[in-house]
A protein has these predicted regions:
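N-terminal glycine-/serine-/threonine-rich beta1-alpha1-beta2 phosphate-ribose binding loop
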Residues: 1-59, 65-83
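Predominantly a Rossmann-like dinucleotide-binding segment in NAD(P)-dependent oxidoreductases
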Residues: 80-85, 90-185
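Glycine-rich phosphate/pyrophosphate-binding beta-alpha loops
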Residues: 181, 207-214
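Short glycine/threonine-rich loop-to-helix capping motif typified by GTGT followed
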Residues: 185-191
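Residue-level detector of beta-strand face positions
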Residues: 192-194, 219
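Active-site beta-strand termini and strand-to-loop segments that position acidic
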Residues: 195-199
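Short, mixed charged/polar active-site loops
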Residues: 200-204
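Conserved small/polar residues in nucleotide/adenosyl-binding loops
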Residues: 222-226
Length: 226
């Protein structure tokens, strides 16, 4: 564990028990559940080890670095019977829960399109005290640790389409590039995707981190937009 983070945590909770690594947490019989909020590439091993240790888990989004990791984690959850939550913000937001209740009740009619955005105006960087900590602290910018905008931001919006329509898309097309923040990062600073469902309804996702004009989600009906 990064010592400055431990020091800051102890300022907030001086009596809290401190662990040097996650294995120590899993070995503690007094711990029933853990929260995984590490860089994305570290999720899989921690989650799988936690299941083996009999812990319940709240894992931050996105669940895994690859689809295979996500599949194996889900199967492990099923086989162990341990509770597994993922940190998709909208699943816990009363506004979205209410909106979905109304959508599923047919209050507004049939959905004919969904448009989602997550735009920001900033380089997504954090200051580093030493150059050798660059990839560790700014892990979101490097493919070794991150999938970029799709796993850090898009996952929230993409959930909306499947939640509202209660099904998964059948086709997807997309494009990404580094067009503004040419600072050595490896992940795209803008992406655009189109998801097509079996009835022809389309959901778009756009994200750019050099302009913050649009956001967040729009569900389109014939006579209104939610």
């Amino acid at each position: 564990i990064y010592q400055p983070s431990i020091d800051e945590a102890l300022k907030l909770a001086p009596k809290a028990k401190v662990y040097g690594n996650y294995q120590e947490v899993l070995e503690d019989k007094n711990v029933d559940a853990i929260l995984v909020a590490t860089p994305l590439s570290a999720h899989y091993k921690i989650v799988m080890d936690a299941f083996d240790a009999g812990k319940h888990i709240f894992c931050e989004k996105s669940i895994g670095y690859t689809m295979e990791e996500c599949y194996h984690m889900y199967q492990k959850h099923r086989s162990t019977g341990r509770i597994f939550f993922t940190g998709q913000q909208r699943l816990f937001d009363p506004r979205y829960i209410k909106a979905m209740e109304m959508i599923h009740a047919g209050t507004f009619g049939e959905i004919n399109g969904i448009h989602t955005f997550w735009n920001r105006n900033g380089d997504w960087r954090r200051s580093v005290p030493s150059p050798n900590l660059e990839r560790l602290i700014n892990w979101r910018l490097y493919k070794e640790f991150s999938k970029g905008l799709m796993t850090e931001l898009a996952c929230h919006q993409l959930q909306i389409g499947s939640w509202a329509l209660r099904k998964l898309p059948e086709k997807v097309m997309g494009h990404g590039a580094i067009t503004y923040w040419k600072d050595g990062r490896e992940v795209y600073d803008n992406v655009s995707c189109i998801y097509v469902f079996d009835d022809g309804v389309k959901m778009t996702f756009d994200s750019i981190i050099s302009n913050k004009f649009y956001g967040l989600e729009a569900v389109s009906y014939t006579h209104l937009t939610l």
